[in-house]
Amino acid sequence: NLKQLTLYAFSQENWKRPKREINLLMKLLKEFLIKERKEIEENNIRLTAIGRIDGLPEDIQRELAISIEESKYNTGMVLCLALNYGGRSEIVDAAKEEITEETFKNFLYTSEMPDPDLLIRTGGEMRVSNFLLWEISYTEIWVTPICWPEFRKEHLEEAIKDYAHRERRFGGLRE
């Protein structure tokens, strides 16, 4: 069972895309937030978000806040949407505080989340695209040629099955 799933839904770099595409992505996000509230509640999922949320359109911020508030007491899987997110921005925002290596994670957007065990990279791209740069230092990566809009439950199951057969060493040697 997954305890935490973070979806890189919209990067800061995505603002460079054509306005028409951005508008479509925001429309899809808003529809998702409204349409999936019931399913999120029925499945006891807690919704969270990371990124520079205040840079999103006001209607998206409002719908996101409603979805987060309505699910905040759910105790099942945590579904985190990375929105207007950039790994470098996260590090810069965290570094604005007086920090040590021990306290650095406390200032990240993801401070209350565990580091990811598995990163699923869609679209066949062999790069991390400015995503969770601090947090994925020992994350296993699974790359699929399937693009995000076509990614389905069976693809997720395939990734998890592959991950289950890996030996995680966190920088150590094989046993």
Named regions from a protein language model:
Residues 1-175:
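Flexible, compositionally biased loop and terminal segments
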